[in-house]
Every structure is written in C-alpha cells, then in structure tokens.
A protein has these predicted regions:
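NAD(P)+-binding Rossmann beta1-loop-alpha1 motif at the extreme N-terminus of oxidoreductases
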Residues: 1-3, 30, 66, 98-100, ...
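Rossmann-fold NAD(P) dinucleotide-binding segment
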Residues: 1-58
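Residue-level detector of anion-binding/catalytic polar loops
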Residues: 3-4, 56, 98, 140, ...
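Short alpha-helical
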Residues: 12-13, 41, 83, 183, ...
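Proline-centered loop/turn at the N-terminus of a beta-strand
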Residues: 31, 56, 75, 198-200
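Rossmann-fold dinucleotide-binding core
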Residues: 37-118
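Helical "substrate-binding/catalytic lid" subdomain
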Residues: 108-204, 208-229
Length: 230
C-alpha cells in the first residue's frame, strides 16, 4: 500500500512495531500517516527514521473522542508536504470529514493540540471547581449549568479577543484590567475558604495574578498575563 496509517496508544507501541520489522526496510514511494500523537522529540526522531528509509511522513492528531471519529465532530490536524496531504485526503476524510493542513512544520499538530488542551483543561477544571462551590452552598447544579451555557458565548468571544490581542501585542486596551480580574479572583478564593473547599486551583490562579501584577501589568488587559508564561 502507498499509505501506512498508524493510530496507536503511544509511540512506545509504534517503536515496538518498527523495531521488529526493520530487516531490509524500504519505504520508497510510501507515506506514513502517523496519528498516534507524540512528544516533540518523538516526532523529530520518527521523521529522521522515515527519511532514513526513503519514506514520507505526515504527522497528525485526531482531535475528538473515539466515538466521534468519522463524524462532523471530529477534526484531524496534519503536517507534512502539501503533495502528501493532497494524495491522502480520501483516506483522511474517512476518519474525519474535517482536516486542517498545518504546513511543513511536523511538530505543529502535537504542539497545537496540546495548546488547545491547556485551554480546555483549565476551563473544565475551573468549571468543576465551581460546581463543588455550588454544592457546598446548596445551589442547584441545574442553575449552575444554565448560567454556564447562557454565558458560553461571552467566553467564546473573550477567547477570540484575547488571542487576537496576544497576536497583535496590544494588551493595554481593556474593559476589565488584570487588577479588576484579580479582585474577582481574590473574592473567589475567599468564598472557597469560607466553604471549606480544596484551594489548590484557586491558589494557583492567585499566584498567577500576583506574578502578573508584580510584572507591572495590573492596568493592562487580561491578555497581558501571557507574558508570565514566556
């Protein structure tokens, strides 16, 4: 076959396969579509291995739950040569009707997917923290869910605005400064203490706000907090 598609539990499983099949290995005319998703080091090592045996590598990730593969909810991120991406689009479309070509930067899929995971995990963990606060205060989780769903469009708009602000470097213009958000977080921490909930998440947030303010960015937009992650 011209294409070899791999989607395994981890790169260790992949390495076990190739380590046992390297006698007279020749990948000339073949493209490996690697959807296992590894670390930056694993991706670069695999690329060197594929080149050694005269093959082409498409590095990618499947961004969805297993039950969503092949549905409109799925998304595949790919990196590699444009010719390889175009040649394998029929195969990729079976796994996901939507795919995005990230160009020749082979580490782009793994970094981009992890970057998205950072935002998604932070939001979901914060939401779970909020749910526990509601439970401790005898507030219905149906009410909590309703307000989360009702305000979701605002979070989406704010996410877009913050990413654009980071991209342009304009982190001064704001309706709500780091200081204002910080006061809100201090109040959240105080409520968490009063309700005797676990403080790990809120203390971590509090530390981030303090670092941002110490960096002289208290009057800047919340997007300025990106500076402390650099």
């Amino acid at each position: 076959s011209q294409f070899i598609v791999a989607s395994l539990s981890n790169y260790e499983a992949w390495n076990n396969i190739i380590d046992s099949n390297q006698i007279n290995m020749d990948l000339s005319g073949k493209t490996i579509i690697q959807l296992t998703t590894g670390s930056i080091e694993e991706v670069t090592t695999l690329n060197d291995w594929v080149k050694k045996y005269n093959g082409e590598l498409l590095e990618g990730i499947i961004s969805c739950f297993p039950s969503q593969i092949g549905t409109e909810e799925s998304l595949i991120l790919l990196a590699g040569s444009n010719n390889s991406v175009n040649n394998c689009k029929d195969i990729i479309s079976v796994l996901s009707p939507k795919y995005k070509n990230l160009g020749s930067n082979l580490i782009a899929p793994t970094v981009l997917s992890r970057a998205f995971l950072s935002g998604a995990l932070g939001g979901l963990i914060g939401m779970m923290n909020g749910a526990v606060l509601c439970q401790k205060a005898d507030i219905s989780l149906d009410d909590f869910k309703e307000i989360c769903m009702d305000r979701s469009s605002i979070i989406e708009q704010e996410s877009r605005r913050i990413i654009d602000a980071i991209s342009t470097g304009d982190t001064k213009n704001t309706e709500a400064s780091v200081s204002a958000w910080g006061h809100g977080q201090e109040a959240l921490l105080a409520i968490s203490k009063t309700l005797d909930s676990n403080l790990d998440f809120q203390l971590a947030l509090n530390k981030l706000f303090k670092k941002t303010i110490e960096a002289g960015l208290k009057d800047h937009d919340l997007s300025a907090m990106c500076e402390i992650f650099k």
